[in-house]
Regions:
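Secretory pathway targeting signatures of secreted, lumenal, and periplasmic proteins
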Residues: 69-126
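Repetitive helical segments and hydrophobic/amphipathic motifs
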Residues: 11-12
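Short, hydrophobic/aromatic-rich segments at coil-to-beta transitions
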Residues: 58-65, 94-99, 153-163
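Stable alpha-helical elements in mature extracytoplasmic
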Residues: 75, 125-132, 202-209
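Bacterial lipoprotein signal-peptidase II cleavage site
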Residues: 4-6, 16-41
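N-terminal low-complexity, Pro/Thr/Ser-rich intrinsically disordered segments
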Residues: 33-77
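Signature of long, low-cysteine stretches enriched in small and polar/charged residues
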Residues: 131-183
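Surface-exposed amphipathic alpha-helical segments
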Residues: 79, 188-218
Length: 218
């Protein structure tokens, strides 16, 4: 009889605990919620801009991953960009052109212009440099002084450096040209232009951006 009463008491206690919820080690109801799935962690990932959504007038802040389909690069934190123009060949996504203005945060004047285009009349690195100097002269309607410096290696690309001085401005250019295979009849000209009034050619920002720039091969 005592054994039966003891079993009934144990059974009653078990039912009581089950009704009140699972007890923790102190005999208190465990009300802890697993917050791993609901906590929001700070988003530190880079903004992503792709060719599918890129259009004139688009802008954004670094850090940002820019993908124009025929080139990609990373814009560091502390800078912003604005798309001046973008287009691509519907039959070949590696053919197209893009021009972006780059600004320091809080500044209204661009410090640099990045241009990549397959719509050009050049077929080599040397012609790319000549084309850059010629365009500078045409834009100012007056011949300036151009000095071709030593080549510079950034990331996967070798850039010719050009320093241009005119009556109106002083600029540095980093110019590279890529032929992307036997089927590439146009090649890609990439030109990074900086305004010396706002940034110098040895600024760490330039290395950081150009180190990240990749030309997409066919």
């Amino acid at each position: 009889m005592k054994k039966i009463l003891a079993l009934l008491m144990i059974f009653a206690v078990s039912l009581s605990l089950f009704a009140c919820g699972k007890a923790d080690g102190d005999g208190k109801e465990n009300t802890t919620v697993n917050t791993a799935a609901v906590d929001k962690t700070e988003d530190t990932s880079a903004e992503v801009t792709t060719a599918a959504e890129m259009k004139k007038g688009d802008e954004g802040n670094g850090p940002a991953d820019i993908n124009a389909e025929f080139i990609t690069f990373k814009l560091p934190s502390g800078y912003k960009y604005k798309v001046d123009s973008f287009s691509k060949d519907s039959n070949n996504p590696l053919y197209g052109d893009v021009t972006l203005y780059i600004y320091k945060d809080g500044s209204y004047s661009s410090i640099a212009t990045l241009t990549a285009t397959a719509r050009n009349m050049v077929r080599s690195q040397e012609e790319a440099v000549e084309n850059t100097i010629k365009l500078c002269n045409l834009q100012t309607y007056k011949n300036g002084e151009s000095e071709i410096g030593e080549d510079a290696q950034y990331g996967e690309n070798t850039y010719s450096t050009v320093h241009v001085t005119t009556e109106y401005y002083e600029k540095d250019f980093f110019v590279t040209y890529a032929n992307r295979g036997a089927s590439d009849t146009k090649g890609l000209l990439v030109k990074f232009e900086i305004n010396n009034k706002n940034i110098k050619a040895d600024d760490p920002f330039i290395k950081e951006l150009l180190d990240s720039l990749k030309i997409v091969m066919a």
